[in-house]
Amino acid sequence: MVFPLLNIYRIATFDPGEKTLSAASGAWWQDLPARYIRTTTYLGLALFSYAYTFPLDRAAVLSYDWMLLILARNVAIGYLLYGGWHHFLYQSRYVRKMTSRKFNPKFPSQKQWDHDRFWSTVGFCIQSAIEIGIMHLWATGKVEYYLDFWQYPLWSVAWMAWVPYWHDFHFWFIHRQLHMGVLYKWVHSLHHKSFNPGPWSGMSMHPVETTIYFSSALVPALFFPQVNIPNSYCTE
């Protein structure tokens, strides 16, 4: 049960620990602390982005001003997260201390870094296009949403709690399909060209796979009423 918390401590103190994959054999609840921290971080980023870079009041008309804002925000967050971890793990003054923690002692090549960063950036553009489409549907009234969180408090809380599990199921399902036949050969194999994974590798995917991956947002966004909390663009 303490495995995730112990690893968080080891990362903070640069304790190399042991090179084992023992976490994979543990019970599902052993990963809850790490999962909670990860999900809470993503939720915080989402709320911050929504509060300051979500111009729903302008989204009824497709125009470059607000669409470029969405793209710039997603690219900036991506480079901050992945680029920040990349710098910390491979270019900062702590690299030597963390080398002993690597399962693969070899560092990724510059060619792989460029490959992963390029396809991740393409992914940020696809992510932005999907978000822009959803925003436009909300703003034009073609998809239902409500502004008052307390209008349906139980539904609002349940929806926020359900979405991470839906995302995990969606990822599990599509990942199984992507490892089959033609989809693997022509689509998913690009992701597996990251032979020595780094922070940029997770989002380094073929555009088709990226589109399928972010399609997880379509089910909750298009088929369930959404709560849009007032932000700096809409205060009523």
Give short role names for the model-derived ranges.
Residues 1-173, 177, 186, 194-221:
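Non-catalytic, topology-defining segments of multipass membrane proteins
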Residues 182-194, 235-236:
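Juxtamembrane loop segments immediately following a transmembrane helix
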Residues 212-236:
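C-terminal transmembrane module of eukaryotic multi-pass membrane proteins
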